Amino acid sequence: MKWWKTIFLSSFIILFCLLLTVSLFSFTLSEITTKENLKVFAGAVLKEELRSAKDLDLEKGYTLLLEQCQFQDTIEIPLEIQTVAIPCSDIKSSTQTTFVNLVINTFVDAIYDKNFDCSFISCLQKLNGTNLAFMLLSNTGHQFYTEVFLAFIALLLIVGILIIFMSEPKIAGIKNIGISIIIVGLGYFAFLYAKALLLSNVEVLSITPALFEILLNNFLILFIAGIVITMIGYYVLHYYEKRIKEE
């Protein structure tokens, strides 16, 4: 292989790894910020906060809330990070057991569907604190992460084609792509170690292990896919070289 082709091929492989890493993280963020997953993750945090709410004991005060609903249409639940307004009609149709889930679902729906009146990038510049955190977890954030993922997948396809084009023989490009995927997939072991280190030395939110699991699963899938593609690439390359020798 000519020296300039080697340089270009190495550059494209490095670029492929970088693009794949960004794609993986954007896909993970998109996965975490679906409304269904957010309700699960936010539920764990909010249940802890609801139990420690100073102004209201939800489990013991459910009867009191029903009494208050005789004189007003909406009840406001004061949480540390956000006040949640719940229609009394929903409270009356719930039970003491399901009321906590009602608060969680109402909270997530309000935050997730909130109109921030700015694009994701401009919101990053304008917002701060709690509002910025809410925006990152909202549908605005979810749509942005999904768009980034799709854009980088398109770039990956282009760079993948360039890797095949620069490889000699071109059929070896499959092997090169597979090895690149394995390199990124090795992040699984790095984050596995980081998870063990973090959870054993730092006090974290109860949802942190679940968030790590999503990221680890995606890295593991990538690692396994890389191994499979590399094996296919070596087999195809071996078959190609064998045919060339026979001819």
What kind of feature is each model-predicted range?
Residues 8-25:
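Hydrophobic membrane-insertion alpha-helices, especially the h-region
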Residues 202-214:
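Short, membrane-exposed interhelical loops at transmembrane-helix boundaries
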Residues 25-34, 236-244:
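Juxtamembrane/interface segments at transmembrane-helix termini
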Residues 220-238:
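Alpha-helical transmembrane segments of multi-pass membrane transporters/translocases
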Residues 2-11, 145-202, 232-247:
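Juxtamembrane interface at the cytosolic side of transmembrane helices
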Residues 35-139:
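Long, solvent-exposed extracytoplasmic domains/loops
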Residues 135-157, 216-225:
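N-terminal membrane-entry
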Residues 27-36, 192-204:
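Membrane-helix interface motif
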